[in-house]
Structure formats: C-alpha cells, structure tokens
Amino acid sequence: MVSYNVLTKLFFIFSGGLVFFFFEFFLNHFNYYPTKLLYYITFYFIKNHPSLFLLFNFFLSTASFSYSFPSKSHLTFYSKGAPSVFFLSLKSSPCPGYCSSTLLYSTSNLLPSLPSPLHAPPPLGSRLLHVFFYRRSNASAYPSFTPRYSFFPSFTLR
C-alpha cells in the first residue's frame, strides 16, 4: 500500500473540499455545461492516474463525512473499505428551483432503478463507476429522485 504523509493527506482533503464546493457553486449559479466539463476533467485524472485515485479514496474512506455549504447542501461520503467501492452524494436541502439537485456517484449500475438511491450503498466488489445527475421533482411533495443526465460512460478502474 502506498503511504502518504499527513500533510499530503490534509492538503488533498482541503483541496478536494474546495473542488466540490465549486462544483456545487456551478450547479446552483451557472449553466449545466461548465459543470459537466469540470466533471470530465476530474474523472479523467481519476481514471488515468491511479495514485490520484488512491488519495481520493483516502478522502472517502476515512469516515462517513459531511459538512454544510453556504447553500445548505451536504456533501456525504460513504465507503465500504475497498479502493474501487464508494458512494458519494451531493444533496441539497429542500428548496425551490434549481438548488434541489443531487449528484450521485456510484459503483453500481442498479442504483438509478432503486426508489431511494441516496440511501442505497453500492455492492461490494463492483468495479464499474457510474455517474448520474439527479434532480428533485418540484411538482411532487415526496422526495423522489429521477435520473435526468448521465455524464460519463462506465469504465473499469485499474
């Protein structure tokens, strides 16, 4: 296992938080396409540079982790301990309009068909990474999420 010093880990956690803060900022205040470009750039590095993915996995696997953005969104990490198995959701608190959005990262291609994808952990051993964008239906009174966009094709993590 590759070992990283504490400063490197802390720097990655801090910079990773900033990256996802700006993702949320773009999602809430700008067009969908600049955000899509940011995701393509990020996952290019995760796919093609395994060492970066190991750092990313450290950020995910330290604990189930959440904090609040100024827009009252929550970035929540779930990890099952395997480097390629994680579940990440960017979840907004109930509010009208475009801010009621959820970004779902999943190692399972079954999650979009589940009734409550935010509470369904991925199966252990899965190697595929799928990224979906969910938006809350403003017309419904219950928290139903439906897939609107699929940003990335599936790929196998090395």
Swiss-Prot record:
Please give the superkingdom of this protein's source: Eukaryota
Compartment(s) where it occurs, according to its Swiss-Prot or TrEMBL record: Membrane
Give the record's membrane topology. Multi-pass membrane protein
* One Gene Ontology cellular component annotation held by this UniProt entry: membrane
Transmembrane parts of this sequence: 10-30, 40-60
Q: Which UniProt keywords apply?
A: Membrane, Transmembrane, Transmembrane helix
The identity of this protein, by name, is Uncharacterized transmembrane protein C343.21
Task: List the source organism.
Answer: Schizosaccharomyces pombe (strain 972 / ATCC 24843)
